[in-house]
Amino acid sequence: MNFKNINKCQLDWLFSTNHKDIGTLYLIFSAFAGIVGTTLSLLIRMELAQPGNQIFMGNHQLYNVVVTAHAFIMVFFLVMPALIGGFGNWFVPLMIGAPDMAFPRMNNISFWLLPPALLLLVSSAIVESGAGTGWTVYPPLSSVQAHSGPSVDLAIFSLHLTGISSLLGAINFISTIYNMRAPGLSFHRLPLFVWSVLITAFLLLLTLPVLAGAITMLLTDRNLNTSFYDPSGGGDPVLYQHLFWFFGHPEVYILILPAFGIISQVAAAFAKKNVFGYLGMVYAMLSIGLLGCIVWAHHMFTVGLDVDTRAYFSAATMIIAVPTGIKIFSWLATLWGGSLKFETPLLFVLGFILLFVVGGVTGVAMSNSGLDIAIHDTYYIVGHFHYVLSMGAVFGIFTGFYFWIGKISGRKYPEILGQIHFWLFFIGVNITFFPMHFLGLAGMPRRIPDFPDAMSGWNAVSSFGSYISFFSALFFFYIVYVTLVYGKKTEN
C-alpha cells in the first residue's frame, strides 16, 4: 500500500498500540456516539411531550426504530467504550505499574471494530423500515415474518462486532491484571477501579458467548429456515428470552461496575483517606458479579414461569441489594469526616450515591414478581433503569472525566463551568426520569408513541427535563473545548 500521501499523524492513530492513545480514541468515539444517542432520546421525548402524534406522524415503527437505536448506541457505543475502553485502557496499566496492556495490537483491533459496528447499527435503522424491535430483539417480532428486510440482520451483525470487541478487550484486561502487576502488588492491594474492570471483564467473558449464540440462532431462523424460536417448527421464543437475559442482566452490571470503581477512587481521593472497608468493597463487587449471573429471569416474570421459579428469582434479586448496600454505606463512610472540597468530581460522586440509591430502591420494588407483573413493560421500569444508567453509569463517566482530564490532557477544566454542568445535568435528569415512575404506576406502556390525555401532565414535565439535560450535554462539549484549547496547564 502507498501511504506516502497520508499524514503521518493520522497513521500513528490508526496503528497505535499505546494504551493511552487507544483509551483516548475510545473516549472520543464514545463522545460522538453519545451525541447521536442523546439526539435520539430528544426525538423520543419530543414525540411524547404531548398526546397525539407529534414528530413521527403516527409512524409507530419509526418511533420504535429510534428507541432501539437509542438503547443500542447508549449501551454499546457510549457507556462501554467510555468506562471500559476509555478509562480502563488509560488507567488500569498505570494503576498496576504495567508498561502497557498485555496484547497491545489486540487492543488496537478491539477499538477499530467499534466504528464499523456503529456503521452497521446506523445502517440497520435507515434501510427499509428499520429495526423496531427494542434493544432486546425478541422474536417473533424480530422474526422474518414481522421484520422482513435486512434491518434486523444488520443490527445482529453490529452486535456481533461489538461483542467480539468487548470479548477481546476482556481477555486483554484479564491477562494484563493477572500477569503484569508490579512486584508486591497482590490482589488484595489492587486499586478498586482495577478490581471493578477485572470483574467486568470476567462477566463479559462469561455472558457474551451466550448472547452471540442467541442472536446467531435468530439470524439462522430469519435466513436459513431453522426454527429455534419458531413454535410451528418445534422452537420456543421463550428460549431466546432466557439466552438473551442471561447476557442482558450481567450486562447492566458490566455497565455499572467500572463506574463503582471510579466512584470509589474519587471518593477516597477527595476524603484524603483510604476507602472504608476495602476488602468488603472488593467482595461486594465480586458478589454482585456472581449474583448478577443467576437472576436473569426477573426480566421474564410475565412469560408464565412456574411459581417456584418466580419465588427463587424474586429472592435472589433482592439479595443483590445487600452487597450494593455495603458499597453505598462504605462510600458514605469514606466521605464521612473527610475535609471535603466540593469540586465537580465530588459533586458527581455525591449525585451518583444519592440517585443510585433511588434507582436501587425502585429495583428492589420490581424484584417482587407479583408487583412486577403489574408494572412490567411500563414507564416505571424505564424510570428505574435510567436512574441507574443515566445517573449511575453516566455520572460515573463524568466523574472520571473531571477527575482525570488533567492527567489525560495535561490541562485543567474550568471549575465554575464544571459545577454549572453538574447542576444543569442533575436537575435535568431528575425532572426527566422521576415522573416516569408515576406514569408507570398509572399504567403507561413502554415503546408506544402515544398515550391517554390523562398522562399528559407528567409527560410534559419529563420532556421539559430532557430539554434541560440535552442542553447540559451541549454545555459539556463546550467545557471540553474550553479545557483543551484554553485550559491552564497542570503542574506536572
UniProtKB/Swiss-Prot annotation:
UniProt entry tagged with the keyword Electron transport: yes
Superkingdom is: Eukaryota
Q: What is the enzyme's class at the highest EC level?
A: translocase
Binding-site positions, Ca(2+): 47, 52, 449
Quote the record's binding site residues for Cu cation: 249, 298-299
- Its Gene Ontology biological processes? electron transport coupled proton transport; mitochondrial electron transport, cytochrome c to oxygen
- EC annotation? 7.1.1.9
Q: What Pfam family is a match, any one? A: COX1
* Ranges annotated as spanning the membrane: 24-44, 72-92, 109-129, 154-174, 192-212, 243-263, 275-295, 318-338, 346-366, 385-405, 422-442, 467-487
Report membrane topology.
Multi-pass membrane protein
Q: Name one GO molecular function term.
A: heme binding
Q: Which residues bind Fe(II)-heme a?
A: 70, 386
| Residues noted as binding heme a3 in the record, renumbered to the chain | 384
Swiss-Prot/TrEMBL cofactor(s) = heme; Cu cation
* Annotated crosslink 1'-histidyl-3'-tyrosine (His-Tyr) location: 249-253
Q: Report the family membership.
A: Belongs to the heme-copper respiratory oxidase family.
Q: What does the UniProt function comment say about this protein? A: Component of the cytochrome c oxidase, the last enzyme in the mitochondrial electron transport chain which drives oxidative phosphorylation. The respiratory chain contains 3 multisubunit complexes succinate dehydrogenase (complex II, CII), ubiquinol-cytochrome c oxidoreductase (cytochrome b-c1 complex, complex III, CIII) and cytochrome c oxidase (complex IV, CIV), that cooperate to transfer electrons derived from NADH and succinate to molecular oxygen, creating an electrochemical gradient over the inner membrane that drives transmembrane transport and the ATP synthase.
Assembly state and interactors?
A: Component of the cytochrome c oxidase (complex IV, CIV), a multisubunit enzyme composed of a catalytic core of 3 subunits and several supernumerary subunits. The complex exists as a monomer or a dimer and forms supercomplexes (SCs) in the inner mitochondrial membrane with ubiquinol-cytochrome c oxidoreductase (cytochrome b-c1 complex, complex III, CIII).
Q: Which protein, by its recorded name, is this? A: Cytochrome c oxidase subunit 1
Q: Which gene encodes it?
A: COX1
